[in-house]
């Protein structure tokens, strides 16, 4: 029996994780849950899974949750300290890190320091503080298992092979809803259009990131830290069908890929059950029915966010943290209809240009950079 804490339990990844747990009550048990927005949904999860402790966004949410609780009454915490408490609970074997954005960094670090294995869906943790997290993972001898479908695919495609035999890793991207949209038409993109992803059902922030290709850029940086790959050995190819989740090319010219239906329950189930496998509940792949798989190069002129991510990775230091923080502010502004679609990448680039990078050592230094970038990005809002 593997005991889990889920950070971000009411979000897209959290809900999919709980669906996998429902299918395998004999393999997984829920010890802790943390969420930030939907107290009513958390109350229902508490009733069903009976965790020992939970955390919510703030004191007001904690009070509201107490009023909604039924017969089962777990310990209730709140804030980032509360999420960190859930991440480090005694008796937890694995923490599913699925809080959206840089807010997931502190509780993920707390989990690692407490010796918990990590199923990582929060890519921002590695984008912001990849060097720190990698060092802590090695120091505390925990497993860092990717939940993103692309990184899970690479993880599986690397299994059993020597690192020195890898020529490059290739991340696939759906291309988002605007793959065929002209640069001129992108100026008129609406929020509603950007929120309609052609393949995946996800939360609002990551859906916008997928539309700008910033999500793929963040995944490039995440892949660098997960697999110890330099930027020049990480490629991106657009694959609209989202069936091949990513690939590894070896020095002999052979390419190993992982295929599957576009359903996050598959990489989640793999991370939860690793090194074994378990049923995920997804539809089995029918290649004859799919018939055609296509590929094309990403257009970094129309989608400069991907270029900015590569630039940040190559520059190193605190640039990836600045990229991420500025993007979070810009996407939030777009979701509030304060800026246009193309303004997202423009705000990120201006913030990066205003930054002088350095190499942080401690967590608080990374968080200070994150705060600086957010404050600076806000100065570029209309």
Swiss-Prot record:
1-deoxy-D-xylulose 5-phosphate binds at residues 123, 149-150, 174, 197, 210, 215-216, 219. One of its GO terms (biological process) is isopentenyl diphosphate biosynthetic process, methylerythritol 4-phosphate pathway involved in terpenoid biosynthetic process. The keyword Nucleus does not apply. It catalyses: 2-C-methyl-D-erythritol 4-phosphate + NADP(+) = 1-deoxy-D-xylulose 5-phosphate + NADPH + H(+). Pathway: Isoprenoid biosynthesis; isopentenyl diphosphate biosynthesis via DXP pathway; isopentenyl diphosphate from 1-deoxy-D-xylulose 5-phosphate: step 1/6. It is an enzyme of class 1 (oxidoreductase). Its cofactor is Mg(2+); Mn(2+). NADPH binds at residues 10-13, 36, 122, 124, 203. Its EC number is 1.1.1.267. Gene3D superfamilies: 1.10.1740.10, NAD(P)-binding Rossmann-like Domain. Mn(2+) binds at residues 148, 150, 219. InterPro entries: DXP_reductoisomerase, DXP_reductoisomerase_C, DXP_reductoisomerase_N, DXPR_C, DXPR_C_sf, NAD(P)-bd_dom_sf. One of its GO terms (molecular function) is manganese ion binding. Keywords: Isoprene biosynthesis, Manganese, Metal-binding, NADP, Oxidoreductase. It comes from the Bacteria. Pfam families: DXP_redisom_C (PF08436), DXP_reductoisom (PF02670), DXPR_C (PF13288). NCBIfam families: Dxr, PRK12464.1. Belongs to the DXR family. Catalyzes the NADPH-dependent rearrangement and reduction of 1-deoxy-D-xylulose-5-phosphate (DXP) to 2-C-methyl-D-erythritol 4-phosphate (MEP). HAMAP family: DXP_reductoisom (MF_00183). This is 1-deoxy-D-xylulose 5-phosphate reductoisomerase. It comes from Chlorobium chlorochromatii (strain CaD3). The lineage of its organism: Bacteria, Pseudomonadati, Chlorobiota, Chlorobiia, Chlorobiales.
């Amino acid at each position: 029996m593997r005991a889990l804490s889920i950070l971000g339990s009411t979000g897209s990844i959290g809900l999919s994780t709980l669906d996998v747990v429902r299918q395998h009550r004999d393999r997984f048990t829920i010890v802790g849950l943390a969420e930030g927005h939907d107290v009513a949904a958390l109350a229902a999860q508490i009733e069903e899974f009976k965790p020992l402790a939970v955390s919510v966004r703030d004191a007001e949410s904690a009070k509201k949750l107490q009023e909604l609780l039924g017969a089962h009454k777990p310990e209730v915490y709140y804030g980032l300290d509360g999420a960190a408490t859930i991440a480090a609970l005694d008796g937890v074997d694995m923490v599913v890190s699925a809080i959206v954005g840089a807010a997931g960094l502190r509780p993920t670090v707390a989990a690692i320091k407490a010796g918990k294995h990590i199923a990582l869906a929060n890519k921002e943790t590695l984008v912001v503080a990849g060097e720190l997290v990698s060092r802590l993972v090695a120091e505390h001898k925990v497993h860092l298992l990717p939940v993103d479908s692309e990184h899970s695919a690479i993880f599986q495609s690397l299994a059993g092979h020597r690192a020195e035999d890898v020529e490059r890793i290739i991340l696939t991207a759906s291309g988002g809803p605007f793959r065929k949209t002209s640069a001129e038409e992108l100026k008129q993109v609406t929020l509603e259009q950007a929120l309609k992803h052609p393949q995946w059902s996800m939360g609002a922030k990551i859906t916008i990131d997928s539309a700008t290709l910033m999500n793929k850029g963040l995944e490039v940086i995440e892949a660098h830290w997960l697999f110890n790959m330099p930027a020049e050995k990480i490629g991106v190819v657009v694959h609209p069908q989202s069936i091949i989740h990513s690939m590894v090319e070896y020095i002999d010219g052979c390419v190993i890929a992982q295929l599957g239906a576009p359903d996050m329950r598959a990489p989640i189930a793999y991370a939860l059950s690793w090194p074994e496998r378990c049923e995920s509940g997804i539809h089995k792949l029918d290649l004859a029915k799919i018939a055609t798989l296509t590929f094309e190069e990403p257009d970094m002129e129309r989608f400069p966010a991907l270029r900015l991510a590569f630039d940040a990775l190559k520059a190193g230091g605190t640039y990836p943290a600045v990229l991420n923080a500025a993007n979070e502010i810009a996407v939030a502004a777009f979701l509030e209809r304060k800026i246009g679609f193309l303004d997202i990448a423009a705000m990120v680039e201006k913030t990066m240009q205003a930054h002088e990078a350095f190499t942080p050592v401690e967590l608080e230094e990374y968080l200070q950079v994150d705060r600086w970038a957010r404050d600076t990005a806000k100065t570029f809002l209309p």
